[in-house]
């Protein structure tokens, strides 16, 4: 093309001379140059979108995929839809942290009495302190395992109680429940659902339930779906801040888990159950 030739040789010959020899109008040449350098409206939008999505993705510590990023950006006033955000992530080669397979904690037969399943996989609660759920998971460090027990309010999915220990004991479960009771100002008649682990069937834990007029409930044997909400939290914890990291000590793991629960998950991590709000935002909105 003549304009391409002129562009390639403009350092050697004058524009005027080349236009005359090639019989093209100089105005046509300059119009072509302007069109080449002008960014289309669509390109401008994509560049703006990519910049905004990258910033939000970075703030989420690479934890959010397209749906949660869309909620986050809409809350900031950007009218993007999920397809637009997903396309931006693909263009930039960005992917949220992915899960990996792990084996759940196995429990030995203990012969202790178990409670009836009062929940029956009905995780809906119309208000706070109606249904709580608890469980224990383990976290690997160079010093050995660190066990984490949590209590979640199924109304908002907030982690209201937690405890960590190098040993998986009944006291670990009791401490997590005690924190939940303290935070929620000791409500009564709450259904507290757990699995059938020895820590939850222990005399100490059962006495704590009875002392505070709480209603114990336990999953069916070997059915992880009966406590799916807590399993989902553990999955998020491990995918978003544990997997891919190396923890040389239990103390570093403690600090990481504390920060995730209290600073990230409860306060600002957007939850689909809460309509795209964080558990804390959901509670503040509905208790105002």
UniProtKB/Swiss-Prot annotation:
Xref: Pfam families: HTH_21, rve, rve_2
Ranges of residues in domain Integrase catalytic: 124-287
Entries under InterPro entries matching the protein: HTH-like_dom, Integrase_cat-core, RNaseH-like_sf, RNaseH_sf, Transpos_IS3, Transposase_IS3/IS150/IS904
Any Gene Ontology biological process: transposition
Molecular function via GO: DNA binding
Keywords: DNA recombination, DNA-binding, Transposable element, Transposition
Family: Belongs to the transposase IS3/IS150/IS904 family.
PANTHER family: TRANSPOSASE INSF FOR INSERTION SEQUENCE IS3B, TRANSPOSASE INSF FOR INSERTION SEQUENCE IS3B-RELATED
Role played: Involved in the transposition of the insertion sequence IS3.
Name of the featured protein: Transposase InsF for insertion sequence IS3A
Protein's organism: Escherichia coli (strain K12)
Gene from which the chain derives: insF1
């Amino acid at each position: 093309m003549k304009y391409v030739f002129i562009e390639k040789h403009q350092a050697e010959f004058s524009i005027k001379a080349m236009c005359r020899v090639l019989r093209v109008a100089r105005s046509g040449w300059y119009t072509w140059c302007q069109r080449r350098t002008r960014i289309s409206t669509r390109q401008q939008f994509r560049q703006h979108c990519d910049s905004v999505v990258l910033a939000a993705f970075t703030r989420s510590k690479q934890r959010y995929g397209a749906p949660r990023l869309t909620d986050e950006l809409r809350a900031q006033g950007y009218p993007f839809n999920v397809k637009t955000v997903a396309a931006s992530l693909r263009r930039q080669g960005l992917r949220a942290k992915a899960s990996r397979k792990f084996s759940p904690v196995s429990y030995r037969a203990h012969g202790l009495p178990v409670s009836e399943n009062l929940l029956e996989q009905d995780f809906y609660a119309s208000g706070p302190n109606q249904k709580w759920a608890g469980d224990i998971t383990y976290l690997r460090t160079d010093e050995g395992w660190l066990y984490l027990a949590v209590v979640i309010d199924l109304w908002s999915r907030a982690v209201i109680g937690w405890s960590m220990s190098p040993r998986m004991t009944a006291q670990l479960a009791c401490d997590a429940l005690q924190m939940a009771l303290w935070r929620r100002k000791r409500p009564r008649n709450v259904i507290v659902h757990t699995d059938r682990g020895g820590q939850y069937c222990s005399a100490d834990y059962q006495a704590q339930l009875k002392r505070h007029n709480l209603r114990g409930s336990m999953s069916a044997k070997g059915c992880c779906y009966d406590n799916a909400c807590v399993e989902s939290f553990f999955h998020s914890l491990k995918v978003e801040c544990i997997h891919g990291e190396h923890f040389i000590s239990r103390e570093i793991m403690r600090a990481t888990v504390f920060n995730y629960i209290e600073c990230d998950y409860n306060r600002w991590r957007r939850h689909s159950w809460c309509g795209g709000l964080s558990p804390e935002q959901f509670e503040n909105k509905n208790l105002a």
